[in-house]
């Protein structure tokens, strides 16, 4: 829909009237504190209770919207577990529709990943015991209900999951949750004039909104001490990719990707964050200057006025998070560590190659998801080369495995992408070296899928069987 001269004049007049500016636009200039999700930790074998239920949340100041969430809040608590633990989760579905949940990036056997075989009907529970045997990493949990994932994640069924180990404990980096170590969950929404999220599934592709949220609020700030600050970034949007940078041009120091630490920090001016992707960064706040993380150019006045008449995919504000330093510089501050891992990341030799094609239409390699069909069979403990192509740029994710990016459109990956991963942005072609460390079975397969959630719901999912070691 084009914006006519008459509509422009009408909207301009409306915008001058007090109280007539939509909340999503008027709130963009106001900053509120960053909500930090509560921390839920596994202790002495005690189970972690995760209740999926309706809740209320204020996306804009002065409003309350009906949402979904975990344990009574939009989104859910941050879960922290330790390598070597056996963690018992008790999911309880208190919604009026079926839900299945998964922890994306978790390295566990297929029966523990969730999915159709672990569907919870209303008032039902699921209580897996998860063996945590992987290295420290930032993961995330979310709904993965067939044909309903996009809507349910958009409604609020998601949260951050942290794995810690001896390496993460011993490194001289910030590790005090909510003090110098913060979860930053980025989403885009479309809010009506009352601050309530609107969701209309697009006819093709994935949903994109015009309002940027971090931990459920617009343009938040957080007060931090002078020194290093650690931000755990998660893109929990349905399909939007972000290009992040600091407002004053200072570098982002990337220390970790989807599956754990990089061998050494990588300093960048701009950082890509694809749907489902996680990255950890360090920001140097020792100079005492306020700084913001941003993600591109915001909507112009014409774009904002057009938003009165039609849904927009252009962000009203591109402000992600403002860091406000407080206090004095500590007498002793840690420098950026030269190394994060004691050894380089090793790679094996692939025993076979596969081609994966993500088309404009739903489906992978021309086939829609079929719960009764296994698309790929692999062997636990082996490596394969997967070449993934996409007709339209989108993120790609594989459950239950780790991979390394070998090349992107024939070129070497960026240094920040050279660690272990489970999610990758595909704009053309990427070559992956995939390691199958966990087994799965025909009734409990792993997924590989488009991380554009609407595309996955329409059938862009394949099923992976990993035969266990004899």
UniProtKB/Swiss-Prot annotation:
Molecular function terms from GO: copper ion binding; oxidoreductase activity
Cell location: Periplasm
Cited InterPro entries: Cu-oxidase-like_N, Cu-oxidase_C, Cu-oxidase_fam, Cupredoxin, FtsP, TAT_signal, TAT_signal_bac_arc
Domain Plastocyanin-like, residue spans: 229-287
Listed Pfam families: Cu-oxidase_2, Cu-oxidase_3
Main location per the UniProt record: periplasm
Signal peptide (UniProt feature, chain positions): 1-27
Keyword annotations from UniProtKB, A to Z: Cell cycle, Cell division, Periplasm, Signal
SUPFAM superfamilies referenced in this protein's UniProt entry, alphabetically: Cupredoxins (SSF49503)
Annotated GO biological process: FtsZ-dependent cytokinesis
PROSITE patterns per the UniProt record, alphabetical: TAT
Modified how: Predicted to be exported by the Tat system. The position of the signal peptide cleavage has not been experimentally proven.
One GO location term (cellular component): outer membrane-bounded periplasmic space
Entries under PANTHER family matching the protein: BILIRUBIN OXIDASE, CUPREDOXIN SUPERFAMILY PROTEIN
Similarity comment text for this entry: Belongs to the FtsP family.
The protein's role, per its UniProt record: Cell division protein that is required for growth during stress conditions. May be involved in protecting or stabilizing the divisomal assembly under conditions of stress.
HAMAP family in the cross-refs: FtsP (MF_00915)
Protein name per Swiss-Prot or TrEMBL: Cell division protein FtsP
Organism whose genome encodes this protein: Shigella dysenteriae serotype 1 (strain Sd197)
């Amino acid at each position: 829909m084009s914006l006519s001269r008459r509509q422009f004049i009408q909207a301009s007049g409306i915008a001058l009237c007090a109280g007539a500016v939509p909340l999503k636009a008027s709130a963009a200039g106001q900053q509120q504190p960053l909500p930090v999700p509560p921390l839920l930790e596994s202790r002495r074998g005690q189970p972690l209770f995760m209740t999926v239920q309706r809740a209320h949340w204020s996306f804009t100041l002065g409003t309350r919207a009906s949402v979904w969430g975990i344990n009574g809040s939009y989104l859910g608590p941050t879960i922290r577990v330790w390598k070597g633990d056996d963690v018992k989760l008790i999911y309880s579905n208190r919604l009026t529709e079926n839900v299945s949940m998964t922890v994306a990036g978790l390295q566990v056997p297929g029966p523990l990943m969730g999915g159709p075989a672990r569907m919870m009907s209303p008032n039902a529970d699921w209580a897996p015991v998860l063996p945590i045997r992987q290295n420290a990493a930032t993961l995330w949990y979310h709904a993965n209900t067939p044909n309903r994932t996009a809507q349910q994640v958009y409604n609020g069924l998601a949260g951050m999951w942290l794995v810690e180990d001896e390496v993460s404990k011993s490194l001289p980096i910030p590790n005090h949750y909510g003090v110098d170590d913060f979860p930053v969950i980025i989403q885009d929404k479309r809010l009506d004039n009352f601050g309530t999220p609107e969701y209309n599934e697009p006819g093709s592709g994935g949903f994109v909104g015009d309002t940027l949220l971090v931990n459920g609020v617009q343009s938040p700030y957080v007060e931090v001490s002078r020194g290093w600050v650690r931000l755990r970034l998660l893109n929990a949007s349905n399909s939007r990719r972000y290009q992040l940078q600091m407002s004053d041009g200072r570098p982002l120091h990337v220390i970790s990707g989807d599956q754990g630490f990089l061998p050494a920090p990588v300093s960048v001016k701009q950082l890509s964050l694809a749907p489902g992707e996680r990255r950890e960064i360090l920001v140097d706040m020792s100079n005492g200057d306020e700084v913001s993380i941003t993600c591109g150019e915001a909507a112009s006045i014409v774009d904002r006025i057009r938003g009165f008449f039609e849904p927009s995919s252009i962000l009203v504000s591109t402000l992600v998070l403002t860091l406000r330093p407080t206090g004095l510089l500590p007498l002793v501050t840690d420098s950026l560590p030269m190394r994060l891992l004691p050894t380089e990341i090793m790679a094996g030799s692939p025993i076979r190659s596969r081609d994966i094609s993500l088309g404009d239409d739903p489906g992978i390699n021309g086939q829609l998801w079929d719960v009764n069909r296994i698309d790929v069979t692999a062997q636990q403990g082996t490596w394969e080369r997967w070449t993934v192509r996409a007709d339209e740029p989108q993120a790609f994710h594989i459950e239950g495995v780790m991979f390394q990016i070998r090349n992107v459109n024939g070129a070497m990956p960026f240094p920040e992408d050279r660690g272990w991963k489970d999610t990758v942005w595909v704009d053309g072609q990427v070559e992956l070296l995939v390691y199958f460390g966990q087994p799965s079975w025909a009734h409990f397969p792993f997924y590989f899928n488009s991380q554009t959630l609407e595309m996955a719901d329409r059938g862009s999912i394949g099923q992976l069987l990993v035969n266990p070691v004899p």
